[in-house]
Swiss-Prot record:
The gene is SS1. One of its GO terms (biological process) is sucrose metabolic process. It catalyses: an NDP-alpha-D-glucose + D-fructose = a ribonucleoside 5'-diphosphate + sucrose + H(+). It comes from Beta vulgaris (Sugar beet). Its EC number is 2.4.1.13. The keyword Transferase applies. Expressed most predominantly in tap root. It is an enzyme of class 2 (transferase). InterPro entries: Glyco_trans_1, Sucrose_synth_GT-B1, Sucrose_synthase_pln/cyn, SUS_EPBD, SUS_N. This is Sucrose synthase. SUPFAM superfamilies: UDP-Glycosyltransferase/glycogen phosphorylase. It comes from the Eukaryota. Sucrose-cleaving enzyme that provides UDP-glucose and fructose for various metabolic pathways. Keywords: Glycosyltransferase, Transferase. Belongs to the glycosyltransferase 1 family. Plant sucrose synthase subfamily.
Length: 766
């Protein structure tokens, strides 16, 4: 007993508690130890001799490859290592600092300026070269040195302080121009003075907050390009189509909010500039009744934002049909070249900021940024590597259907090329104490027989920033605010959708007792979203079935309607579950709904019925539907794997559920029992969710933050251009020598109908 106690309290037990994986190749056991998020160590235990040795990353991955190849004798394997290029980049060391990159960077920059006044010179140079379409802004040639800048600022301060605060810039423009200042400081005397005070403070005693405020207010971003390549990118009748879901909603809401913020800032900067936002996506000639075959489409609710569509083409010509996001790789280089010409033509010059979305959009953003020398921001939405366990080491098993060697290589290049990366949650970057983050999983991995990644991405890199989005408040608002709208006129349509007994391609299943509250879920119908898992949990729980009905909005209910292999498998599974658990009378399956206004009212209608929203995904990077439901006041039960675990405070603003443990459906049962006993309990959880959204998840906060990040990282890109050049040369070499061949190995799609065998191909894990 004493020996066991010593073992359980000793260092080896700490190793076991922190172990993420173990590889057994007798007589050795190699263990990957993760004492805290972002920090990894590797050890190997000889079980026969009971000794322990520390391994390098390369040695551990070499040992791991033996699981696939047997005894690995190849000592000359291509290894990717980005660490040497990042030695000059400052980074935090505490796990709690991950995702707050801009704060750390501001501390570093202000500290450098404070300790060494020579570090102020890049700021002066940056302000002096600042132009938009050839027009000089901020400083002109009268100011050549820091001393001259300080003197001019003091002189301008003395002049401006005597003017009324609301004096328009035009009335004193020529006076301060003679001192060395151009447009961009502000639209009134008060705002110009405020900006000049910020710069004087930086020159005298720089601090992080002042530096961030100043850089964030600089007029730097007028033209933005947003890449979203795969799926059907449109504004109507697209949601629920293959590869078309939350990312589209995210970007359209982002663009509306971003344009509003840009217009406000440009006005306050005293500039007469028209901003432009281009969403660049794929043009699909066979558009299935959507607008995806139109080259240009104005974004509704905006003045200066458009969707620019560019087709996929090869030597065979333009590809007419949709193809899966897993099959786009051979088209992306040509797509990038074509898009570059279209972008420059539309904007009459280069953009100021390029934002990539998902793996394909991020690699295209990297190629465009590399070509144009523009600040690049990445948004992953979801990294597939964490969705499919062991998809790196057993990559060959996945390659024919998923081409993960291309996708993970593209992800790796894009995240190292980006100037800054936005995530919606901490977990997306570095996971939790017990789970590995999406980005963190790219720190070290191996493709046996292809290459090893010994240092892919460092989650402590200050390029990572958590900026959470919100829901469109014009569509998603609390159920208690219905008196401000006439949307209740939609209730007849909603009631038909939920309760009409007719069985057709839009809805199947009936609800016998329409007075019962509804468990509601809405998502794409694929394996990871796990809608069928929710249906199975419900089917197994007799008490829950007695207390509430289940309604899901997901995909098609007819396999003939879908060309997506995962969706087809899930459709077939759903039909099996309906029969197996005899769900008739308690379950309604509604096909995907693309009318967002009606969807918003649907959430509120479920509120009126005393229902809940369930989000059962195996993993959810963020959870936009969770935010939408909570914004409407609907109590929400969502996966504990990924973003929803941060959005929801368990038991306060909603509930966490673990989709890997079906018995957690009991949480929903307990909720409905409590609501029967205490009608105020539903209201309490609803109010908790609304408060959480108001505090953390709004598009206004998102856009303000994004514009500030663009300013700070634009300056950092200018300051650190020499260090970044080496990284980009390394990436360029990897792209040309390795990635191109991987992309070209993916078969080109055809416009012929897929065979039945291809259509029903499903995911098979190792």
């Amino acid at each position: 007993a004493g020996g066991k106690q010593i073992l359980s309290d000793g260092p080896f037990s700490e190793v076991l508690r922190s172990a993420q994986e173990a590889i057994v190749v007798p007589p050795f056991v190699a263990i990957a130890v993760r004492p805290r998020p972002g920090v990894w160590e590797y050890v190997r235990v000889n079980v026969s001799e009971l000794n322990v040795e520390q391994l390098t990353v390369s040695e551990y991955l070499h040992f791991k490859e033996e699981l696939v190849d047997g005894k690995a004798d190849d000592h000359y394997v291509l290894e990717l290592d980005f660490e040497p290029f990042n030695e000059s980049v400052p980074r935090p060391t505490r796990s709690s600092s991950i995702g707050n990159g801009v704060q750390f960077l501001n501390r570093h920059l202000s500290s450098s300026m404070f300790c060494n006044k020579d570090c102020l010179e890049p700021l002066l140079d940056f302000l002096r070269v600042h132009k938009h379409k050839g027009v000089v802004m901020m400083l002109n040639d009268r100011i050549q040195t820091i001393q001259r800048l300080q003197s001019a600022l003091s002189k301008a301060e003395d002049y401006l302080i005597k003017l009324p605060a609301d004096t328009p810039y035009s009335e004193f423009e020529f006076v301060i121009q003679g001192m060395g200042f151009e447009r961009g400081w502000g639209d009134t005397a008060e705002r110009v003075l405020e900006m000049m005070h910020l710069l004087l403070d930086i020159l005298q005693a720089p601090d992080p907050s002042t530096l961030e405020t100043f850089l964030g207010r600089l007029p730097m971003v007028f033209n933005v390009v947003i890449l979203s390549v795969h799926g059907y990118f449109g504004q109507a009748h697209v949601l629920g189509l293959p590869d078309t879901g939350g990312q589209i909603v995210y970007i359209l809401d982002q663009v509306r909010s971003l344009e509003h913020e840009m217009l406000q800032r440009i006005k306050k900067q005293g500039l007469d500039v028209t901003p432009r936002i281009l969403i660049v996506s794929r043009l699909i000639p066979d558009a299935k009744g959507t607008t995806c075959n139109q080259r240009m489409e104005k974004v509704s609710g905006t003045e200066h934002a458009s969707i620019l569509r560019v087709p996929f083409r090869s030597e065979k010509g333009i590809l007419r049909k949709w193809i899966s996001r897993f099959d786009v790789w051979p088209y992306l280089e040509t797509f990038t070249e074509d898009a570059a010409g279209e972008i420059i033509g539309e904007l009459q010059g280069r953009p100021d900021l390029i934002i990539g979305n998902y793996s394909d959009g991020n690699i295209v953003a990297s190629l465009l940024s590399h070509k144009m020398g523009v600040t690049q921001c990445n948004i992953a939405h979801a990294l597939e590597k964490t969705k499919y366990p062991d998809s790196d080491i057993y990559w060959k098993r996945f390659e024919d259907k998923y081409h993960f060697s291309c996708q993970f290589s593209a992800d790796l290049m894009a995240m190292n090329h980006a100037d800054f990366i936005i995530t919606s949650t901490y977990q997306e970057i570095a996971g939790t104490k017990n789970t590995v983050g999406q980005y963190e999983s790219h720190k070290a991995f191996t493709f046996p027989g292809l290459y090893r990644v010994v240092h892919g991405i460092d989650v402590f890199d200050p390029k990572f920033n958590i900026v959470s989005p919100g829901a469109d408040m014009a569509i998603y608002f609390p159920f208690s605010e219905k008196d401000v709208t006439c949307l209740t006129s939609l209730h007849r349509l909603i009631e038909q959708l939920l309760f009409k007994p007719e069985q057709n391609e839009e809805h199947i299943g009936v609800l016998d007792d329409t007075s019962k509250p509804i468990i509601f879920s809405m998502a794409r119908l694929d394996r990871v979203k796990n809608i069928t898992g929710l249906v199975e949990c419900y089917g197994k729980n007799a008490k829950l079935r007695e207390l509430a009905n289940l309604v899901v909005v997901a995909g098609y209910n007819d396999v003939k309607k879908s060309n997506d292999r995962e969706e087809i498998a899930e459709i077939e599974k759903m039909h099996r579950l309906i029969q197996e658990y005899n769900l008739r009378g308690q379950f309604r399956w509604i096909a995907s709904q693309t009318n967002r206004v009606r969807n918003g009212e649907l959430y509120r209608y479920i509120c009126d019925k005393g229902g809940i929203f369930a989000q059962p995904a195996f993993y959810e990077a963020f959870g936009l539907t969770v935010v939408e439901a909570m914004t409407c006041g609907l109590p929400t039960f969502a996966t504990c794997h990924g973003g929803p675990a941060e959005i929801i405070e368990d038991g306060v603003s909603g509930f966490h559920i673990d989709p890997y443990h079906a018995d957690q459906a009991e949480k929903m049962t307990e909720f409905f029992v409590k609501c029967r006993e205490d009608p105020n309990y539903w209201t309490k959880i609803s109010a908790g969710g609304l408060l959480r959204i108001k505090e953390r998840y709004t598009w206004q906060k998102y856009s303000e933050r994004l514009m500030t990040l663009a300013g700070v990282y634009g300056f950092w890109k200018y300051v650190s251009k020499l260090e970044r050049r080496e990284t980009r040369r390394y990436l360029e070499m990897f792209y040309i020598l390795k990635f191109r061949d991987l992309a070209n190995s993916v078969p080109l799609a055809t416009d012929e109908e897929p065979s039945t065998t291809d259509a029903v191909a499903t995911f098979r894990g190792p």
